[in-house]
Structure formats: structure tokens, C-alpha cells
């Protein structure tokens, strides 16, 4: 049965895996992999794992930058979709997206698990919206202004790749992230990794609770 299959959680680095597993404990229906940084590595490593056995679905979990006034440091973001804004071509008239070129799409769809997000919202501010997957993290005012126009709530680097891998196996995909810093001019003195990793641990705890209920992940999502 579908609800007996494991769910794959993909994180980019070992520190995220450790925080997530602290919250999950021993959970037989969940598997966690480190898929690497950037959406190329994330796509390849997630697809490699998905090829080994059947899964119920895939969730990309990690830290992210939040756009000011949309997702504050310490909050959680849930993707309604993922956009990779750099895929396309330059021209004298401006950027041309891969969609406009006719070679693919810069957008991947994501599901929001209502039971999981509902439980998380009891103890966290949870924001829903577009999460960007970028090749180069924003670090200047110029880049911030360009990306802010896209209306996203957060910026990360792996969601597009993990989503593409899940799609190739016809599996549902979600992306959940905790906000460690504001998107904008790079200033590590204002980042809060401990709070973000604490949030990842709490996401793990909540996933464990959901899986132990009669309800299971991906049985109630949109």
C-alpha cells in the first residue's frame, strides 16, 4: 500500500541531516539522504536514491534565505512552487527564460501537506509561496532587486533539482525550509544558523508525529 512506502527526505549538507534526525528519532517510514549543494547535485543524487526502491514521496528540507517582510528569520517556509530564475539566455533586450525559449521550464510544482503544515503552525510562523532555486545565492543589492520582483518568499539552491528528480519518478514533492538569514547584501553577522537548525529539528519531530498518527504524509496535500 502507498502509505506503507517510505518517504525520502533530501537535505543538502550533513549538519541539516543531523538536526533532522535528532527530531525524527527512529522512524521506519522515513529515510534521509544528503543530496549535495546546488540543484544539479541534488537532482542526480535524489534520482539515484529513488531508483533503488519504491517511495511514497520526496521532501526537500533545509535552511534558506527569507525575503524581507515575507519570511522572517526563524520562520518556516513551505513551497507552493519552485522557480529557478537563472535558467535561460541573455539578450540585448533582457533575460529570456527557458520557457520563452521553448526548451523546458524554470518552474517545478510542489505540494503543501496540510496536516504537517498545520501542526508546524502551532509553534512557528509558517509562510507559503514560491521558493527560488538559485545557482548563486544573492549577495548584492542589484541581485536582490532583480529577484525580489519575482514575488518569492525565500531563496535556496536545491529544490528545483529534487523536484525534477521526484517528477521523473512520478512522485509527489514538497519543500520545507527554515529561515536563517534575510535575502540581500551578504552579511554573515546577521545570520542565525542555530535558530534555523533548531527549526529543522522541530520539523523532524513534527514529521514523526504525523507519521505516527493514522494520517500519513502525502495523503492530504495540495
What residue spans do the PLM features occupy?
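Basic/polar N-terminal segments that are highly enriched at the extreme N-terminus
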Residues: 1-2, 222
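Extreme N-terminal starter segment of soluble prokaryotic enzymes
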Residues: 2-8, 30
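Short polar catalytic/cofactor-binding loops
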Residues: 12-16
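Glycine-rich phosphate- or other oxyanion-binding loops that anchor nucleotides, phosphorylated ligands
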Residues: 18, 22-222
Amino acid at each position: 500500500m502507498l502509505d506503507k512506502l517510505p518517504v525520502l527526505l533530501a537535505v543538502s549538507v550533513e549538519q541539516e541531516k543531523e538536526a533532522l534526525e535528532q527530531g525524527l528519532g527512529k522512524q521506519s517510514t522515513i529515510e534521509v539522504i544528503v543530496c549535495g549543494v546546488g540543484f544539479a547535485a541534488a537532482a542526480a543524487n535524489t534520482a539515484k536514491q529513488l531508483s533503488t526502491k519504491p517511495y511514497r514521496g520526496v521532501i526537500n528540507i533545509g535552511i534558506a534565505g527569507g525575503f524581507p517582510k515575507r519570511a522572517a528569520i526563524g520562520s518556516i517556509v513551505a513551497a507552493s512552487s519552485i522557480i529557478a530564475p537563472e535558467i535561460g539566455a541573455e539578450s540585448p533586450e533582457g533575460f529570456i527564460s527557458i520557457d520563452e525559449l521553448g526548451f523546458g521550464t524554470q518552474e517545478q510544482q510542489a505540494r503543501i501537506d496540510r496536516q504537517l503544515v498545520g501542526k508546524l503552525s502551532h509553534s512557528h510562523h509558517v509562510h507559503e509561496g514560491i521558493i527560488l532555486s538559485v545557482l548563486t545565492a544573492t549577495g548584492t543589492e542589484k541581485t536582490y532587486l532583480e529577484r525580489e520582483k519575482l514575488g518569492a518568499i525565500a531563496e535556496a539552491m536545491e529544490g528545483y533539482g529534487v523536484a525534477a528528480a521526484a517528477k521523473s519518478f512520478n512522485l509527489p514533492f514538497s519543500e520545507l525550509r527554515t529561515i536563517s538569514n534575510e535575502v540581500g547584501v551578504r552579511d554573515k553577522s546577521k545570520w542565525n544558523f542555530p535558530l534555523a537548525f533548531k527549526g529543522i529539528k522541530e520539523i523532524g519531530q513534527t514529521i514523526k508525529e504525523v507519521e505516527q498518527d493514522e494520517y500519513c504524509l502525502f495523503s492530504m496535500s495540495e
